[in-house]
Amino acid sequence: MLEAAGRNRNALAATPGEGWALHRMTPASRLNGANGIRTGADGRIYVAQVAGSKVSAVNVDTGLIETISPNGGGIVGPDDLAFDEAGNLYCTEITEGRVSMMTPGGEYRVIHGDMPVANPITYHQGRLIAGELRLGGRIMELDRDGGAPRVIYEGVPMANAFEVGPDGKLYFPAQGANEIWRIGLDGGEPEVVAKDLGVPDSVKFHPDGYIVSTQVYSGQVLKIDPRTGAKSILADIGPGLDNVAFVNGRTFVSHINGSITEIVEAGRTKPLVEKGLQWPLGLAVDEAGHVLVADGGFSYLLRPGEALQLAGMLFSPGFPGWIRDVAASGPDEWIVTTANGDVARWRPAAGESTVLASGYARLMGVAVGPGGDAVFAEFDTGKVFAIEGRAKGGGAGSGNVVELASGLDRPMGVAVAGDGTVFVAESGAGRVVKLVGGRRETVLDGLARPEGIAIAGGTLFVADPGANAVIASDLAGGARETVASGLPIGGAAGAQMAQLGGVGDMCGPMNTFNGIAAAPDGTLYLSADAEGSVLALRRL
């Protein structure tokens, strides 16, 4: 049995099938990432979680976490949040391009529905102000009764988490300029407060009057004098920082990976919530048994007996983009599909990537065949393609892309057998098919919503989040077995997690994908997105 844990702690325990053992390779995550944070009237920190379409509240003394707005609730992809004096919660929904409100009684409504890449939001003396994380973005005062907004300023190079300072002006990161600006609430021309930063993504005022700003690229938390722009380092936590909140003079910062850290004093920190995985998505194992874990805007390497090591992120040199699935193609070399519709070869250690094919709609699974062809599935069109001979050690070009199949029902996972036969999981049809001479033959049916698939030792393994199970089928005889059930994959009782749209020009649709991969030693690795961990399954 694998007891429920982390953000999935109220679920049922998972059960391995007869002859199988099941355990976690990484701890279960307690949050679905951590984006905007704000202190509530009750002294708890409220956390917006884009990946989980969730808002949670964290007790800073006990670490206890309570879900305030759940996945599947009325708030979708919240990036930042604010409260008014009546206790109404306002959230920017970055993938929906809107601002929504939840009342203390749990009722939802949209405040403003035309704000592409909605991100920062704050409330000050009866005024609700929100902005857009895009080049040329707007900062606007919103009418909470649904009237037309008032534009405070248009033309910001990516506004992020902001706050009104003691002088009554709005201070905000101009992220694209790598600067902090301020502007009067009635408009005018902005002034530069600080420059030459580490890509700031939040500006908050400590009760003592100085600015605390997280730097998403450098990973530093800076203390900045709003009068002179002079700065010093409060902490160096690592790339991916997001936001800041204060509780009774204590300083807390969030990280996109789901951690919340208290800065006790300059240079000294302690965790409130430990880091984890936001999703995770696709998995691949190389010949050395190293596992690459795709976690959207982050990817990690998992080596047996070691903790997760960051392989790359959206701000890393050569990172190919928001990654959905991965396949091993050589030492420190991986083929990936991205939310932007690209297939790319990525070499994390070298900090470089090469686009092999582009312009596709919602790419899902990818696999590399014995001859080096990269096979990938396009969800929206129901097609499967191959890049001939360019996946392993090819040059910089895109390669020759050929269509292998069309008319598939929401294809997701792909796998290639040792003889080159291509297998595809049709999530919409609840089956796995193989492609033979332009025809499709059903290999395994009666599934709920198959996603990731893998082949090892003549056996097909299927991650089926619709059934919260992993199924195995003997490709020679067709016999099937349940490898594990009650797994923390997908939603409760097989429900699908909220599917998110894109984030402006930065990222295409952020759809979930349950990956499964087989290691040379026979171990199966599974992305457990419901709890944010990687699981391992082994035959006894």
Per-region residue spans from a language model:
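Structural signal for beta-propeller blades
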Residues: 53-55, 97-99, 136-139, 178-180, ...
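Blade-level signature of beta-propeller repeat domains, shared across WD40, Kelch, NHL, RCC1
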Residues: 509-540
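Blade/loop signatures of beta-propeller domains
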Residues: 1-22, 132
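A short beta-strand motif characteristic of beta-propeller blades
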Residues: 22-28, 64-71, 106-112, 147-153, ...
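Short loop/turn segments that connect beta-strands within beta-propeller blades
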Residues: 59-63, 102-107, 142-147, 183-188, ...
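Short loop/turn segments immediately following the C-termini of beta-strands
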Residues: 50, 94, 133-134, 175, ...
